[in-house]
Amino acid sequence: MKWIVKWHEKELRSSIDRFKEMACAIDPTRDPIEVLKSTIHVSYSTPEEMFNDMKKFLEIARDHASKYIDLPQDIVCEVTGVREFEKDIYPMGYAGVPDPLEKETKCMIALNQYNYRAFSRGWLMMMAIHEAYYGHNIHWIKVGLADIPESFKIPSDIGSPLAEGLAHRGEELLQDIYGDKSFPLLVAWRRVHTALRVYIEINMFLYNKITPEDAVKLYMNIMGFDEQTAKGLVEAHLENRGYNLCYLAGYKMIEEYRSKLRDLDEKTFSNTLFSAGFISIRNVKKVLDIKEDMPWEKD
């Protein structure tokens, strides 16, 4: 935790600055959030348009992810809507990950057709990576097919930093795959999002410097979210304390490991991490046979 505290404020500032610089390069006359919303983060007009785009983005993500990780030939990721009773439970849908113990290679992504106006082209591009290819679905499949103890194939909270860190890493690793020059802007905005999550976790729960109401305002002012969305995000902080650290902290830990293994090719590195099982991200050091002390071990 001391390691995260050291960098959390600087990370948020640098993420915001990078997002603003990228938006300014596209259109220096407008607010960065407005640039985002007018280019890559435009709402869909119909559910059908949303579903068709998601299928297309999944195909693109699969083709390009295979450059970074070995994928089973028979992998299938279907796109479906949510059931009516799920529409309020999953406002943005969910990833239907396969059962690793059954060695399944079929997975799915459910999009909330009742809330289609909340989706944009850029958000679906990001979901196709984060939830599927170089993200959660392929992670669960790789774990299921790996030659590791069965106990390592049982999902658990201890594996969350590795799982979310890998999926978040994929967003930046594959940000150029769609041939859309504005998608990296959404990826930069997403980085602000995960950095703000860390900032709120630390200042709301560790230091007690901000209230939930303050956190809602931060999500609205920094991210451009409406009040309802911001309140939902803060509610997630309150219901699952600590989880929102997993995305960015996990990603940064993975990159620290990567920096120690520059002679290792990317595909071998990715295959190793995706097939390690649902283990503590600290134990990844043993899997990769890294002898040096990591930054979080020095605090």
Per-region residue spans from a language model:
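N-terminal maturation segment of proteins
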Residues: 1-299
